[in-house]
């Protein structure tokens, strides 16, 4: 808006929230005000990319068009809806959670079961969103479905393949598709620019999703007799673990990026960034014994710097690359274990998990913010 108002020779003020926006425009003589509110919110990186292209090309193209032609161009962008069917989005969530499972310490059994359960859970969630069901309902139903599916397929695997019950911990990973990474991280970026209304509303939205999801997952765990135990140790060499982490990080970020409605090329670019940044984070924790929160800051900073460098060549919006690439670093496992332990009144463990989660969650947007400060002059100063 700053760039377009400068091109048009007008002054603009805007009040942005999660569900509404109020816009005022002055040209020295007249004032025009517009307001808009929506019933639901979501992420559409493809539309964001087209909007950024519109702004970038405005001085050469749109500035010479009539008002009617500009409205037609904006209408074309507005018509960009979901690029993928619910089945494909379910598959994307399955891939993301499968990669997430390995990165959290799970083995092949947990990965396969999480793949199936997360795919079904997100398929149901996508169907509910498509039919405009309320946020609480789609979170509760999709998380419950994922946990139930994991438990059913684990029991079938025990009966058919004689797999031991040691693999039940993976049920946590099957619901990680619900993690509100985009609002969590963008709320921090908004707060860094003192956009308090937008930042606090996004943060509140993210907290609501986490609370509802973890509470229903806890209830399902009690009903299905599941416990968030530690994963069985994987006996891998350092080199093999490094290679698998790169692959799992790439797959996880690619899946999350597809869920954000990115094109295949945009998702692959974000996955490339995430594979480097997340593997670096995990290796720092393992080999330098760096605290996870500090490693998360370095990982997010790396992702932000890489995205800024790549943006110069392909023009993808920075936020469409950075957020998917670090969503996989959001400690959903820690948050769930915190709520689970609160539920069974194991308060010492709950506070420990919750504190660790908060430290990492704060560090992730902080890393992106400082990467943006280093590489974006307009972000470096108050505007």
Which residues does each predicted region cover?
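Soluble N-terminal domains of membrane-associated systems
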Residues: 2-82
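Hydrophobic, membrane-facing alpha-helical anchors
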Residues: 58-72, 87-97, 115-125, 221-228, ...
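Core alpha-helical transmembrane segments of integral membrane proteins
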Residues: 83-186, 258-260, 264, 269
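Alpha-helical membrane-inserting segments
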Residues: 99-104, 120-129, 145, 149-157, ...
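Structural signature of hydrophobic alpha-helical transmembrane segments
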Residues: 103-117, 166-180, 232-248, 288-301, ...
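Membrane-interface helix termini and inter-helical loops of multi-pass transporters
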Residues: 157-166, 224-238, 341-353
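C-terminal transmembrane helix-loop-helix hairpin of multi-pass membrane proteins
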Residues: 170-175, 188, 194-209, 272, ...
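Membrane-embedded hairpin module used as a gating/binding unit in multi-pass transport
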Residues: 186-236, 240-256
């Amino acid at each position: 808006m700053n760039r377009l108002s400068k091109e048009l020779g007008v002054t603009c003020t805007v009040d942005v929230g999660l569900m509404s926006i109020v816009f005022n425009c002055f040209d020295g003589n007249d004032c025009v005000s517009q307001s808009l509110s929506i019933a639901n919110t979501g992420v559409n990186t493809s539309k964001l990319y087209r909007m950024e292209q519109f702004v970038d090309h405005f001085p050469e193209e749109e500035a010479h068009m009539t008002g009617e032609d500009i409205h037609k161009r904006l209408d074309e962008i507005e018509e960009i809806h979901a690029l993928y069917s619910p089945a494909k989005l379910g598959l994307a969530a399955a891939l993301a959670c499968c990669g997430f499972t390995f990165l959290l310490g799970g083995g092949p059994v947990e990965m396969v079961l999480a793949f199936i359960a997360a795919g079904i859970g997100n398929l149901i969630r996508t169907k509910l969103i498509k039919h405009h069901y309320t946020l609480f309902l789609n979170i509760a139903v999709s998380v419950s479905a994922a946990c139930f599916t994991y438990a059913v397929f684990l029991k079938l695997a025990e009966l058919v393949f004689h797999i031991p019950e040691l693999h039940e911990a993976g049920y946590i990973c099957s619901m990680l598709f619900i993690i509100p990474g985009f609002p969590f991280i963008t709320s921090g970026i908004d707060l860094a620019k003192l956009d308090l209304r937008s930042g606090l509303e996004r943060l509140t939205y993210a907290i609501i999703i986490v609370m509802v999801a973890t509470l229903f997952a806890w209830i399902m765990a009690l009903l299905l007799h599941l416990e968030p135990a530690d994963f069985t140790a994987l006996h891998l060499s350092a080199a093999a673990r490094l290679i698998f982490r790169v692959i799992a990080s790439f797959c996880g970020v690619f899946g999350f990026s597809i869920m954000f409605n990115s094109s295949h090329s945009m998702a692959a670019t974000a996955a490339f960034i995430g594979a480097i940044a997340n593997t670096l984070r995990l290796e720092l924790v393992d080999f330098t014994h760096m605290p996870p929160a500090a490693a998360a800051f370095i990982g997010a900073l790396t992702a932000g710097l890489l995205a800024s460098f790549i943006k110069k060549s392909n023009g993808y919006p920075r936020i469409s690359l950075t957020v998917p690439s670090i969503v996989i670093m959001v400690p959903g496992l820690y948050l769930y274990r915190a709520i689970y332990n609160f539920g069974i009144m194991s308060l010492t463990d709950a506070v420990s998990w919750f504190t660790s989660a908060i430290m990492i969650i704060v560090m992730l947007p902080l890393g992106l913010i400082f990467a943006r400060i280093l590489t974006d002059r307009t972000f470096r100063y108050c505007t």
